[in-house]
Amino acid sequence: MEKAIITLSLLFMTTFAQGQSGMQEQINQTALALEQQVIEWRRDFHQHPELGNEETRTAGIVAAHMRDLGMEVTEGVAVTGVIGVLKGGKPGPTVAIRADMDALPVTERNDLLFKSQVSTNYNGQETGVMHACGHDSHVAILMGVAEVLAGMQEDLKGSIKFIFQPAEEGLEDKSVDSWGAKQMVEEGVMEDVDAIFGLHINSQTPAGVIKYKPGPSMAAVDNLEILVKGRQAHGAYPWSSIDPIVTASQIVMGLQTIVSRNVKIIEIPAIVTIGAIHGGVRHNIIPEEVEMIGTIRTYSESQQTLIHRRIREIAGNIAESAGAAAEISIKKMYPVTHNDPDLTASMLPTLEKVAGKANVWLHDPVTGAEDFSFYQKEKPGLFIFLGGMPPEGDSETAPSHHTPDFYLDESGFVLGVRALSQLAVDYMELN
């Protein structure tokens, strides 16, 4: 009896492995066949970029493609978002895969045949519009993934929800409610989802490489505003003033001690940056007020609470000691992008299978942020980085994201198609 059980177990494992191998081969072949189409999609989106909640052309192309693949399609989610649902031929979990669609108010400098042709008025200034963060590639890659998995529909053990999201970069006002992922969650896109996957292309990581990190991967973001109120006076009679410029300067220096003296940086980093100071209109007038704005980056709620408290203490006490007052506003924006440790561990073999073990790198915490974190607050998620730097590139000098010279090596896109497709299939097989 025991021998029979062992034999059946070995037979099951062999059959499972053969099935997995067959599906992997189908994914690889279909992705390779689609490579040029994915590149063409990306070039089209790159030439016709659209800002947050204005992605109507992009969304229309996506929705038409999803319908052509026989999916249930919902448009107008969170303003311009598109959801496509592919129901597999066998019962199982629902896996979500997300791509963001929006571009940035950046004037492109690259001399490409598919260079951006779009300009706009943004916050009162004329500017170009550019896919300067690679979201054009994200959309094209996920369209490729949809086609790969649609061709395997009858063999899928569960359902796939394709999320094409607007406004990852936020809107002009950068309000806490302007992030596309937050709006999508509020409209219920995660209610029937068991796990979610996403990727971000990286222009300073070699094409062919995938980066990952379990736990806190990208920072939480808070917006900081400090208004220092003093007493206005003639610049020739400073003793008559309570100078908010001097006070603001002392506050800026005082804030530098938070990370260097209050945060245990050997465990995890943190950032407090003052990005702008506005005060005064004339060389010989000490103003009444000075406004400072900045950003806070943290990786845990306890770290976030500590930094918020110290900002209020330092700014408030320095202002009070000068006879001034400080009005402090801290708005929570993105949560931490937190890769579920169990999900990450279970999917690591998939990443290594797809890219090769030598090409799967563990990355340090990233001080940038992603609204993918809103999905991860609802369900387990894994967010990876996909290399997009040419082989001859140097990660120290390659043009970074959000710049006019941002550039991607398109040869890395097919790995993104294979990786997201395989993650979805393997998750469904394991769950």
Question: Where do the PLM segments sit?
Answer:
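Sec-dependent signal peptide recognition
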Residues: 2-9
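Hydrophobic h-region of N-terminal signal peptides that target proteins for export
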Residues: 10-18, 34
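Metal-dependent amide/peptide-bond hydrolase catalytic core
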Residues: 20, 68, 246-431
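Acidic/His- and Gly-rich active-site-bordering loop/insert found
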Residues: 20-130, 140-157
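Soluble non-cytosolic domains of exported or imported proteins
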Residues: 32-36, 49-60, 132, 136, ...
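Divalent metal-coordination and catalytic microenvironments
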Residues: 45, 84, 97, 135, ...
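Hydrophobic beta-strand positions in extracellular immunoglobulin-like domains
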Residues: 86, 228-230, 296
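Histidine/acidic-residue-rich, glycine-tolerant segments that coordinate divalent metal ions
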Residues: 119-130, 136-137, 148-267, 271-276, ...
